[in-house]
């Protein structure tokens, strides 16, 4: 649990992860927490059961399930104009970084949609791919 993040109702979707502190561009915000799951079949089975996807793939056979033992970062919503991004870091971990300066009270967002597999997006960003 971070003292710099909180979870509350989001205007994008359900609940969101919000900054309680100022984050400067490229600063690490937090680690994405959860249970490390190994085995693509096991991961796929979890994906089918989850209403809101909280699984982040590390490689083709390993993922982190933020629905089990996760923290506030499991509630980061998608935006076509994100303010943060994820990077895999050593030790089967995923870190969240600020893409630009983020103010306290601002919702953290990441572009986690696959451009090769378009789907309807309702993120509300001015440059949302569904508006094109």
Task: For the regions a language model picked out, list residue spans one by one.
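Catalytic cores of histone-lysine modification enzymes
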Residues: 1-86
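C-terminal SET catalytic tail plus cysteine-rich post-SET Zn-binding segment of SAM-dependent SET-domain
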Residues: 18, 52, 80-132
């Amino acid at each position: 649990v971070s003292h710099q993040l909180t979870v509350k109702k989001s205007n994008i979707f359900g609940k969101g992860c919000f900054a309680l502190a100022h984050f400067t561009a490229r600063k690490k915000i937090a680690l994405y927490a959860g249970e490390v799951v190994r085995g693509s079949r096991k991961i796929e089975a979890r994906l089918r059961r989850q209403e809101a996807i909280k699984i982040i793939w590390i490689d083709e056979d390993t993922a982190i399930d933020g629905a089990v033992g996760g923290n506030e970062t499991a509630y980061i919503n998608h935006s076509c104009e994100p303010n943060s991004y994820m990077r895999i870091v050593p030790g089967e971990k995923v870190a969240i970084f600020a893409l630009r300066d983020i103010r306290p009270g601002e919702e953290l967002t990441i572009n986690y949609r696959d451009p090769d597999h378009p789907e309807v997006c309702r993120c509300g960003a001015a440059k949302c791919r569904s508006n094109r």
